[in-house]
Amino acid sequence: MALVEDNNAVAVSFSEEQEALVLKSWAILKKDSANIALRFFLKIFEVAPSASQMFSFLRNSDVPLEKNPKLKTHAMSVFVMTCEAAAQLRKAGKVTVRDTTLKRLGATHLKYGVGDAHFEVVKFALLDTIKEEVPADMWSPAMKSAWSEAYDHLVAAIKQEMKPAE
């Protein structure tokens, strides 16, 4: 992950090739983003079943995960934000989620005790989902690397906001 310091802002170096790979795959993914987003979250819970307990709307719910409307909405929001942030990374030179959103994400992730292991599970699920959803001849080590780096930048931006209230 290449970072370039500029005053107090941290600029991201994301290559033209990486951007092209992310944009090409995102163009395919966003056509069915609601269903893909749900599969992404179901994969998270498959890898880490206890993760579902981190979501208040899933605790004590009798609704199957794949039919839970709140999970569908949340999954869509997370998936689209992650993919859009990745798609804008090179052009913007930084993660382009609004500051208020980053602050809220940081506070929420801190409140629920989200740690590095959780972010790694989500990263695994994201990369695996993208691999499954793009045409087989499109997926490559370079595409995996591009998405991985983009995700790492988003997580770094969220972690910067994961500070206890003073």
Curated annotation (Swiss-Prot):
Q: GO CC annotation: what is one? A: nucleus
Positions marked as site (Homodimerization): 144
Query: Which reactions are catalysed by this chain?
Result: Fe(III)-heme b-[protein] + nitric oxide + H2O = Fe(II)-heme b-[protein] + nitrite + 2 H(+)
Q: EC number(s) per UniProt?
A: 1.7.2.-
Q: Would the keyword Metal-binding turn up in this protein's UniProt record?
A: yes
A Pfam family it matches: Globin
Q: Where is the Globin domain?
A: 13-163
Q: How does it assemble?
A: Homodimer.
Q: What's this protein's name?
A: Anaerobic nitrite reductase NSHB1
Question: Its encoding gene is what?
Answer: NSHB1
